[in-house]
Amino acid sequence: LAQPASAEDSAQGEALSPPASPKEGKGAYFSDWFNQDLTLIGSKDISFGPKPNDDIYLEYEYFGRKGPFELYGYVDVPKILGIGNDNDKGVWDHGSPLFMEHEPRISIDYLAGRSLAVGPFKEWYVAFDWIYDHGSNSANRANTLYSGLGTDIDTHSRVNLSANFYGRYQWENYGASNEYSWDGYRAQLKYIVPISTFDNGASLTYIGFTNFDFGSDLKNDPARTGNSTVATNVLLYAFTHLRFTLVGRYFHNGGNWQDGSELNFGDGNFRARSDGWGYYAGVGYQF
């Protein structure tokens, strides 16, 4: 069979760091290949909608590779400490109690039993990206499935590079007009660059990923756009267990909202802020 890629061969696992513990003695709920961590994250000016959010939330994250299956995902509990700006609602104040994203890929090479590499494209996958925001009710809920084709790209360098191309099916979308339809596409690029290791056992890694969504029929609606770009840049300083992250994320038409458009959601006019930088800082434990 085609050899499964290790965590170091793919940029799909966005939290690349040293193994959480020695292979022996991880217990019934741990494994050598499945990595997990819990992180408390503070965020500022996050523009997935027309009103930027500030929040402190708890995130459970996992990643790993087993046979043909490459897994990455996370589950967030918004506003876990009850701290956020006026736009922010979470688990304790009738907002969303749960937000999650899961990005499994299945190796076509592995299932075919041979390498299907072409030039720099060294492995191929059936790829998915499922994003779900539970919301407080159906009008405040989002449920999106991206499905398509993915690949790992040989850069002949320390840079790990992966790419995915998806079509999007939209179930709920906070009441938007594109609900329950196939609507647009996503081109996704992920890249990981190990920067350095230190005498204290820590490592410093740059992790980046860019999502370009395009072709949405939302462009036909007032104050909405057919495309959206989110570019994320992460610095991860990680020990065997303890992890520190700093993130700068750039939004353009975040959530398919037109930056600067005048809106009114029932509490007065305001101008959408869907372009610009948002920031995160986190402290976590990998196990």
Describe these PLM feature segments:
Residues 273-287:
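Outer-membrane beta-barrel "beta-signal"
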Residues 51-55, 93-99, 119-121, 138-144, ...:
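Transmembrane beta-barrel outer-membrane domains
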Residues 1-31, 286:
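Cleavable N-terminal export/targeting peptides
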Residues 22-34, 63-73, 108-125, 153-162, ...:
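Short loop/turn motifs that connect adjacent beta-strands in outer-membrane beta-barrel proteins
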Residues 164-241, 252-259, 287:
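Outer-membrane beta-barrel transmembrane domain signature
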